[in-house]
């Protein structure tokens, strides 16, 4: 009895001695745990609460010792070796921590979980037991405190795959992308994850099998406003002629060519996607549709001017011959030089005709005729020479345009003195050798001179029109002459 008591006391002493020698202060915890100053121990971090969208692809997040698991929403959970229960799937991304969870065996061994979950370290898990069921995987584990990290720098800890011990004796993630220990292809981008890594395709590419292939953004409308050009890993937008890309590099806006680079020679009008040039009056667009060429209006029509058309840059003007003036821009009107200026002497009278003027003597009477106050040349009865001559001669002047249309009444002759019981007859005494005129009697005392052949000027034509007066009983016979000077102008206006 005394021997047993002695052994017991010795054992207690040894235990007490060992506890005293191995006392170590713990203030740091492994990944997945944090120090609880109240309870003075490491406690598990619920990543399902603090990690946004911890699980992807419709998986549910279940907290795990030192990490978390991503499980199908229909997975079953066995708690403390009880029978499986169908768990109502929680909302995506919500916490589902429990003492027993369903997971694939590969999850527990590798530490990398589908959908993003991971197990922090083997020491923290405290040795979970994985069993495969018919429709589920069962992890049976004994809850254990996480491994605390001693302050002794020489102390070695065991880290999960994808982690390594740091100089502060904590498990830290291995950056496989920086270390070059990943197996991503040359056309892929390595993305470091906690405890692992992922191979992604660069922007503009998508994974097809094990390769990254270009995404043809142009087949996914509406990227570009007008035209899309696909390039390896990207794309760019183009605009049709007359448009340019806006600041967003997507929308096409109209280019105002009239403001930016006006190519029009005269007038520019901007339209959507293009522009048009117009010319001022008197010009027309050339074949290049940009420059303007003068329109030779004089060649387009022969009826613009009455006499002569003169082309000028952008316009035209009309000219008239000497003796005429331009009226209403196109018509020629005779200038009456007798009213403005003339070179006739005092003993001459000025006679205006179409296109000019002429000076005639104020006293045209020739011997034996004498001038009367009525401007008539009368042959005195007392003069024997007058017996075979017309009793009187009257001088008249008229002007007609060249090439006047025929037949045309041009002059009327009428008796100034009417005698009773007399008969008057009219005839062309001279000046009608070529038959240009015809005298038509219109009444017993008058007749009309008719132009029957066109006359071209400039020329002067003198016609003697005679009126014979005979008494009805034949007692006397007399003759009077009207000497008509017809001046034909040089033009038809």
Curated annotation (Swiss-Prot):
Disulfides per UniProt: 177-190, 184-199, 201-212, 218-228, 224-237, 239-252, 258-268, 264-277, 279-292, 298-309, 305-318, 320-332, 338-350, 344-359, 365-377
Transmembrane segments: none
Record InterPro entries: cEGF (IPR026823), EGF-like_Ca-bd_dom (IPR001881), EGF-like_dom (IPR000742), EGF-type_Asp/Asn_hydroxyl_site (IPR000152), EGF_Ca-bd_CS (IPR018097), Fibulin_C (IPR055088), Growth_fac_rcpt_cys_sf (IPR009030), Nephronectin_domain (IPR052235)
Protein name, entry field: EGF-containing fibulin-like extracellular matrix protein 1
Localization terms from the record: Secreted, Extracellular space, Extracellular matrix
Gene name in the database record: EFEMP1
SMART domains (alphabetical): EGF, EGF_CA
GO BP annotations listed: epidermal growth factor receptor signaling pathway; negative regulation of chondrocyte differentiation; peptidyl-tyrosine phosphorylation; regulation of DNA-templated transcription
GO annotations of cellular component type: extracellular matrix; extracellular space
Record-stated family: Belongs to the fibulin family.
Source organism: Macaca fascicularis (Crab-eating macaque)
Sorted UniProt keywords: Calcium, Disulfide bond, EGF-like domain, Extracellular matrix, Glycoprotein, Growth factor, Repeat, Secreted, Signal
Spans annotated as Mediates interaction with TIMP3: 259-493
Subunit structure as annotated in this protein's UniProt entry: Interacts with ECM1. Interacts with TIMP3.
Glycosylation sites: 249
Gene3D superfamilies: Laminin
Chain ranges of the EGF-like domain: 26-71, 173-213, 214-253, 254-293, 294-333, 334-378
GO MF annotations, alphabetized: calcium ion binding; epidermal growth factor receptor activity; epidermal growth factor receptor binding; growth factor activity
PROSITE patterns (alphabetical): ASX_HYDROXYL (PS00010), EGF_2 (PS01186), EGF_3 (PS50026), EGF_CA (PS01187)
Keyword Repeat: yes
Functional description taken from the UniProt entry: Binds EGFR, the EGF receptor, inducing EGFR autophosphorylation and the activation of downstream signaling pathways. May play a role in cell adhesion and migration. May function as a negative regulator of chondrocyte differentiation. In the olfactory epithelium, it may regulate glial cell migration, differentiation and the ability of glial cells to support neuronal neurite outgrowth.
Cleavable signal peptide: 1-17
């Amino acid at each position: 009895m005394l021997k047993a008591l002695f052994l017991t006391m010795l054992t207690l002493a040894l235990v007490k001695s060992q506890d005293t020698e191995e006392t170590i202060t713990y203030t740091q915890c492994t990944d997945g745990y944090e120090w609880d100053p109240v309870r003075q121990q490491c406690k598990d971090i619920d990543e399902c609460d603090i990690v946004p969208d911890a699980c992807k692809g419709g998986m549910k997040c279940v907290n795990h010792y030192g990490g978390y698991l991503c499980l199908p929403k229909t997975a079953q959970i066995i708690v403390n070796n009880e029978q499986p229960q169908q768990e109502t799937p929680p909302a995506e991304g919500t916490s589902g921590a429990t003492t027993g969870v369903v997971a694939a065996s590969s999850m527990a061994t590798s530490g990398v979980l589908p959908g993003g979950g991971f197990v922090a370290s083997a020491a923290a898990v405290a040795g979970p037991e994985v069993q495969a069921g018919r429709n589920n995987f069962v992890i049976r584990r004994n809850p254990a405190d996480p491994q605390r990290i001693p302050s002794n720098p020489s102390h070695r800890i065991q880290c999960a795959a994808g982690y390594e011990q740091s100089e502060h004796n904590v498990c830290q993630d291995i950056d496989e992308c920086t270390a070059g220990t990943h197996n991503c292809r040359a056309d892929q981008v390595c993305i470091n994850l906690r405890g692992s890594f992922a191979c992604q395709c660069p922007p503009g590419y998508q994974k097809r099998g094990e390769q990254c292939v270009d995404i043809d953004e142009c087949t996914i409308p509406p990227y570009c406003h007008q035209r899309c050009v696909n390039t390896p890993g990207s794309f760019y937008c183009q605009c049709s002629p007359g448009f340019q890309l806006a600041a967003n590099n997507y929308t096409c806006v109209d280019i105002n060519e009239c403001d930016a680079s006006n190519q029009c020679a005269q007038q520019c009008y901007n339209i959507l996607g293009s522009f048009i040039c117009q010319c001022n009056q008197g010009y027309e667009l050339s074949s290049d549709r940009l420059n303007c060429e003068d329109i030779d209006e004089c060649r387009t029509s022969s009826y613009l001017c009455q006499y002569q058309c003169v082309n000028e840059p952008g316009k035209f003007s009309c000219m008239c011959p000497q003796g005429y003036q331009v009226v209403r821009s196109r018509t020629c009107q005779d200038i009456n030089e007798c009213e403005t200026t003339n070179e006739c002497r005092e003993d001459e009278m000025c006679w205006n005709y179409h296109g000019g003027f002429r000076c005639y003597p104020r006293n045209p009477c020739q011997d034996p005729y004498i001038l009367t106050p009525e401007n008539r040349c009368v042959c005195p009865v007392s003069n024997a020479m007058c017996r075979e001559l017309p009793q009187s001669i009257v001088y008249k002047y008229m002007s007609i345009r060249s090439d006047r249309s025929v037949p045309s009444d041009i002059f009327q002759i009428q008796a100034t003195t009417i005698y009773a019981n007399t008969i008057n007859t009219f005839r062309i005494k001279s000046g009608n050798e070529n038959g240009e005129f015809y005298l038509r009697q219109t009444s017993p005392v008058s007749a009309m001179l008719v132009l029957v052949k066109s006359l071209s000027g400039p020329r002067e034509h003198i016609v003697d029109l005679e009126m014979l007066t005979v008494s009805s009983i034949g007692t006397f016979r007399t003759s009077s002459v009207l000497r008509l000077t017809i001046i034909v102008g040089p033009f038809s206006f």
